[in-house]
Amino acid sequence: MSARAGIVVTGTEVLTGRVQDRNGPWIADRLLELGVELAHITICGDRPADIEAQLRFLAAEGVDLIVTSGGLGPTADDLTVATVARFCGRELILDTELEQRIADILRRLMGRRTDVDFDALRAANRKQAMVPDGATVLEPVGTAPGVVVPGSPTVLVLPGPPRELQPMWRTAVQTEALRSAIAGRTEYRQDMVRMFGLPESGLAETLRDAERDLAGFDRLEITTCLRRGELEIVTRYEPDAEPVYRNLLTLLRDRHGSAIFSEDGSLVDDQVAALLAGHTIATAESCTGGMLSARLTDRAGSSAYVAGAAVCYADAAKVELLGVPADLIADHGAVSEPVAEAMADGALRRFGADVAVAITGIAGPGGGTELKPVGTVCFCVRRADGRVVTRTVRLPGDRSDVRERSTTVAMHLLRRALQDG
């Protein structure tokens, strides 16, 4: 039987939804990569009684490892370490070496500031150097150290900020205490296929057929997710079940090959960035208000290929900034393929790019008509060599959904245009 784990995400701000939980899903993925079965993810506030209740619940479920995130700071409501110590039956002790390391970090953070009482600050942070007796201390990334407390179950305590938690995780998995806790793990492989342009119902039908016809299908653990208008198919399996996965992949290619854009989990954003090497791109956006250009520039190194972007929400801006003829808008409407093409042409000329993408649409909630309801979005990808692709789609969802899905459609139109040479 595989080792089992549970996750406790702490923080009233997470529990109430003011802050989105990024740690639980991230830790879950890392556990699955290690071959550890995830039993539960729980979220609770900062009260020690609530944290301890979650720890006891997971222990009663028979998990081998509990991972907590949050509550390691110097303030009064940061009580996770003390709660874990009590749960594990360990005394809190002052680690003087850790206290000095934290003091050194604080001194570097303060720099030359003279308006802060360093001794008072150090005393306030002494709490972070109190660790459960017998625990393995994980070097702080910020000022908060993590700890691994061996036992049944073993408890790994990590800080809340993802920028601190993620590098600390890599250290934690190398500790003897954690490796011992997950020693019973089963080795798994995990593969991801990404699709675009296929309805979930089409994929569901194929998976039903695979379940009926593929020998060994029950050895594959498959999860599907619709994200940003794309379908993700994640398959986890033991190494000797790889032939079964290969048969499934062959079936997916045979039925939905045109929809598959990634068999290694790579994002369309990564693919577009690679395809733009040696080229430059410009964007012209209306209803998405710069979301496409933001997505393009999220990638490090995007300055090598992003020439410029224009957000032309008003019709007058389309005319003045991109040179879209006013009579074209009058004849066809701002949300039309001719206007999208003119916007792309204007962006191409204004920024001197090799390729341009334009988006114009009705995101809602108002503005729709019988002929052009809310969700109608027009796209154009134009190349400097004269090749052009235009599309009109009707996207479901609310305003936010339409805008986000529009950027995804644009990225895939761009990907296909660039792949065509």
UniProtKB/Swiss-Prot annotation:
Membrane-crossing residue ranges in chain numbering: none
Lineage: superkingdom: Bacteria
Matches recorded under InterPro entries: CinA, CinA-like_C, CinA_C, Competence-induced_CinA, MoaB/Mog-like_dom_sf, MoaB/Mog_dom
Family as reported in the entry's similarity comment: Belongs to the CinA family.
Designated name of the protein: CinA-like protein
Species this chain originates from: Mycobacterium sp. (strain KMS)
